[in-house]
């Protein structure tokens, strides 16, 4: 079962289930959080609520009012007010990145994931963030294609395209 928004750590703890581990202390399973407003798409989170609780415990000032980005396969943008998760939205950020970089024309310009690890190009990532921030509604598909043209024209080196795309999608 999910705890409905607005949700706080007490509600999550109260709905957690203890499962015997067989190795000592029980394992607590948190219930997850449901955002379900009548005029909006429903949304669920499982696990990220624990990350939010930990962040609020480490940074108590954030509990008053903050917006948290939880990057990942299904990134979350969560609005926090008075220590409660009041709303959030999930995005297929990581999954979309994987599809675009591994199964589309964009990936042909990027170094293979099997190559040695490289340094993150923070400037390319920040460029992707700023292009997305300054965009108009409906521009995302054009911006994604721009990843290809930035590589083709040499405005970004191939090794930086993944970082640009990541910034664009986040």
Predicted ranges, named:
Residues 18-25, 130-142:
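An acidic intrinsically disordered interaction segment
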Residues 12-14, 48, 89, 93, ...:
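Generic structural signal for well-ordered, non-membrane alpha-helical segments
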Residues 1, 72, 170:
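Short glycine-rich phosphate-binding loop at a beta-alpha junction
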Residues 1-55:
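Glycine-rich phosphate-binding loop and adjoining helix at the ATP-binding site
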Residues 8, 116-121, 136, 153, ...:
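Alpha-helix capping and helix-coil boundary motifs
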Residues 133-169:
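Adenine-nucleotide phosphate-binding core of ATP-dependent small-molecule kinases
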Residues 31-132:
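Glycine-rich phosphate-binding loop plus the immediately following alpha-helix
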